[in-house]
């Protein structure tokens, strides 16, 4: 974890601008993810002629690479400093675009082209884990550990914004100039971000002996489990709300997803200081309660308005879960290990979103679509109970956690 430079307290607009000046690098990395997201499956299946399996694999490779490389990103950020990790990650985003470009140029050799696409996706996954983890830690190093929750919140806001912006823009660029034009745009985005990052002042890496990975995992896994359980609610809404509306014979599934996103972002903007004021665990328990009510409303909905209110509440409830628990998780380890702690904590969400779809699909095929929302509410209730137990633990078992309140 970087050591923040002592300076007068930041607040309000100046604080947010300072954070945004760093998390914009994560925005750039996620823009390189969003731009090809709606293009590559159709390109692999319809243009290159490969099966739907390969189309799905090309997309999934990035997520697997992110999952496997994220703990290394946190550890190297602790050892080398977050700026170097961010630049390294952005270089990976640039190389992914180069992979797409060469894949487009070798379209007459489908197997070679597919391998180059896969290589680009793997490099992108590694780049994103380094750029995302590094930008969070860089932001904390710039504004101080008191504002960890706000840095995490802004990082997630720019993530969703980049993905929402990137997908439609990617389709436009692809129709305009094909895969090669899209690849050049991706390379340009990454290159501009690299050139903006290099001149920025370096935040020093923390001094001290790092804890072994097993020790870091032992400090944060309970917070990660609570996050993973709560993420199931997000997973079933993002993956199956369209199918839920189809089964019910309703229109407006896309609007429901928009409501979820607006509630998610709006809650973070409305309550930027909530974690500092009442503590991460308290905020998490409030969020779990709201998310449970929302998921239950969706599960028992007999009218479209009930489902929409439920989705809105679920989005608002899930919004602050990641930063609220993350603040406590990273403060459960010494400062020189907080990068590894944040990365390890984030892996639990990655895993949860990876397994929620298949498991919910099995439950849905057995008991129907609405049941998955009731089951997700039950998982969030377990997260609420787990967080309540964590709050009741003696303070010495979660060092520095109280400082977030």
From Swiss-Prot:
SUPFAM superfamilies reported in the protein's UniProt record: MFS general substrate transporter
PROSITE patterns from the UniProt entry: MFS
Predominant subcellular localization, coarse grouping: membrane
UniProt protein name: Uncharacterized MFS-type transporter YhhS
Topology versus the membrane: Multi-pass membrane protein
GO molecular function: transmembrane transporter activity
Family per similarity comment: Belongs to the major facilitator superfamily. YhhS family.
Membrane-spanning ranges: 19-39, 47-67, 85-105, 129-149, 157-177, 178-198, 224-244, 252-272, 283-303, 309-329, 344-364, 366-386
Any one cellular-component term (Gene Ontology): plasma membrane
Localization of this protein: Cell inner membrane
Signal peptide: none
């Amino acid at each position: 974890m970087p050591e923040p430079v002592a300076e007068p307290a930041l607040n309000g607009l100046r604080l947010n601008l300072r954070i945004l000046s760093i998390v914009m690098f994560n925005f750039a990395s996620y823009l390189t993810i969003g731009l090809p997201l709606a293009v590559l499956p159709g390109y692999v299946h319809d243009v290159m002629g490969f099966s739907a399996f390969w189309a799905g694999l090309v997309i999934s490779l990035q997520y697997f690479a992110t999952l496997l490389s994220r703990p290394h990103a946190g550890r190297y950020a602790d050892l080398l400093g977050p700026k170097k990790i961010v630049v390294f990650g952005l270089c990976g985003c640039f190389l992914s675009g180069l992979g797409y470009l060469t894949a487009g140029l070798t379209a007459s050799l489908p197997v070679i082209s597919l391998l180059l696409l896969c290589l680009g996706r793997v490099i992108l996954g590694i780049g994103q884990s380094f750029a995302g983890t590094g930008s969070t830690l860089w932001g904390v190093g710039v504004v101080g550990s008191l504002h960890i929750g706000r840095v995490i919140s802004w990082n997630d806001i720019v993530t969703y914004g980049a993905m929402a912006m990137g997908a439609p823009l990617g389709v436009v660029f692809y129709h305009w100039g094909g895969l090669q034009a899209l690849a050049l745009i991706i390379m340009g985005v990454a290159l501009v971000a690299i050139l903006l990052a290099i001149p920025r002042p370096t935040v020093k890496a923390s001094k001290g002996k790092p804890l072994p990975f097993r020790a870091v995992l032992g400090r944060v896994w309970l917070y990660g489990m609570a996050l993973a359980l709560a993420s199931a609610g997000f997973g079933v809404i993002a993956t199956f709300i369209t199918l839920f509306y189809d089964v019910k014979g309703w229109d407006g599934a896309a609007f429901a997803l928009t409501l979820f996103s607006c509630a998610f972002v709006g809650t973070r903007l409305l309550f930027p200081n909530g974690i500092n004021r009442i503590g991460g665990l308290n905020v998490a328990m409030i969020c779990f309660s709201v998310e449970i009510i929302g998921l239950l409303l969706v599960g028992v909905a007999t009218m479209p308005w009930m489902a929409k209110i439920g989705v809105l509440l679920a989005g608002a409830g899930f919004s602050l879960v990641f930063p609220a628990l993350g603040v406590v998780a990273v403060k459960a380890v010494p400062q020189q290990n907080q990068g590894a702690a944040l990365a390890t904590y984030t892996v639990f969400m990655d895993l949860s979103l990876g397994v929620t779809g298949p498991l919910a699909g099995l439950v849905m095929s057995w008991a129907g679509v609405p049941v998955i929302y009731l089951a997700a509410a039950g998982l969030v209730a377990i997260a609420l109970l787990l967080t309540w137990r964590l709050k009741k633990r003696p303070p010495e078992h979660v060092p520095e956690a109280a400082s977030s309140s």
